[in-house]
Swiss-Prot record:
One of its GO terms (molecular function) is imidazoleglycerol-phosphate dehydratase activity. It comes from Bacillus cereus (strain ATCC 10987 / NRS 248). This is Imidazoleglycerol-phosphate dehydratase. Signal peptide: none annotated. It catalyses: D-erythro-1-(imidazol-4-yl)glycerol 3-phosphate = 3-(imidazol-4-yl)-2-oxopropyl phosphate + H2O. InterPro entries: IGPD_sf, ImidazoleglycerolP_deHydtase, ImidazoleglycerP_deHydtase_CS, Ribosomal_Su5_D2-typ_SF. Its EC number is 4.2.1.19.
Length: 194
């Protein structure tokens, strides 16, 4: 099974995270940031991934360090779980509607970290979650996993719905990208490596 478990401990956070790419039965998320827990759970469920997260952070300051560090550890686990990247689709994309909002995510498991994030988040805070941390999370994942990630909110009026559409689209796009494909021999690249 393609899986990884890692712990990251700094003076600001302690993150324990396990990711299973091929078994989505076990999802348990506790970061101390309720809205973020909800989004990570949606990502795992819609990607059909197993995900267990236990995070302690300096949320008395704000949620920035916790959200960013969870993104870093998730990216590290994704990179480790994929190993050589042989036989996977490599690319994945998904449009996901959430009522009046539409989110889009495209992913390339390229070995090159890059992110494009586009979207207007008009409500600056959802519970204890600063909505600008949405981009910070995706940036942390992309850089740690060495993937190219495009995330875009096409339209919508409800900030919760916009972010939810993105996290669901992220799960679905990543699921497609990491899916094993019997028609692919080696890695899906003319270079012979990713």
């Amino acid at each position: 099974m393609r899986e990884s478990s890692q712990i990251r401990e700094t003076t600001e956070t302690k993150i324990k995270l396990s990711l299973q790419l091929d078994d989505g039965k076990n999802v348990s998320v506790r970061t101390g940031v309720g809205f973020f827990d909800h989004m990570l759970t949606l990502f795992a469920r819609h990607g059909r991934f197993g995900l267990q997260v236990e995070a302690e952070g300096d949320v008395f300051v704000d949620a920035h360090h916790t959200v960013e560090d969870v993104g870093i550890v998730l990216g590290n686990c994704l990179k480790e779980a994929l190993h050589s990247k042989e036989g996977i689709n490599r690319y994945g994309s998904a449009y996901v509607p959430m009522d009046e909002s539409l989110g889009f995510v495209a992913i390339d498991i390229s070995g090159r970290s890059y992110i494009v994030f586009q979207g207007e988040l008009t409500n600056p805070k959802l519970g204890d979650f600063d909505t600008e941390l949405t981009e910070e999370f995706f940036r942390a994942v992309a850089h740690a996993a060495n993937i190219t990630l495009h995330a875009r909110i096409l339209y919508g009026s409800n900030t919760h719905h916009k972010i939810e559409a993105l996290f669901k689209a992220f799960g679905r796009a990543l699921s497609e990208a990491v899916e094993r494909n019997a028609n692919i021999t080696g890695v899906n690249s003319t270079k012979g490596m990713l």
